[in-house]
Amino acid sequence: VVATVTEEKRMRENWNGVAIVDLSREFLNSNGAERHADVHVLPGTVWQPQWAGSTFAEKLENLVGDLNVCSQKGLGERFDSTIGASTVLMPYGGKYQLTPTMAMAAKLPVDGETTTCSGMAWGFNPYLTEADPYRGAYMAVVESVTKLVCAGFRHKDMYLTFQEYFEHLNTAPERWGKPLAALLGALDLSLIHI
């Protein structure tokens, strides 16, 4: 037995005969203590990709030498992608097995065989998001949804989840403006187009 539902408006948890948790239903409904913050969203700036070099050849060489762009096949070959026996897509595809897979697909764990799978993809450009959190989050949704659609998933069946990585916010309204702008960018695209 994990839990027993009673008519009492309290959530109680016992361990070895000792009550270790005793919370009122009103507190649970409140989602904790109420908090407020002042927020000021600064206008975003334009991000223009820049690569070191004076000629096209130098810029291209610096671009493909960037760890965010270069091939990660050697690293991927060090891991067994078939562990768990539910993987649908291999890490690399194409005629020569050199094209990285842009999404993850795995069969659902059920008894017997299944033709149903779940998919997952991500999108994020740290440079764009640093310059304009609203546009960065907006484009992160575009990128992740596009990857899944290209992998064969229907955009109407997708659920979005968001992870945020921002500096410690303290009480500075401008700092609070960054996650708010990112949330609004992701929400804007999600409500209108997906």
Where would I find each of the regions flagged by the language model?
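Glycine/proline-enriched, intrinsically flexible loops and inter-domain linkers
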Residues: 1-192
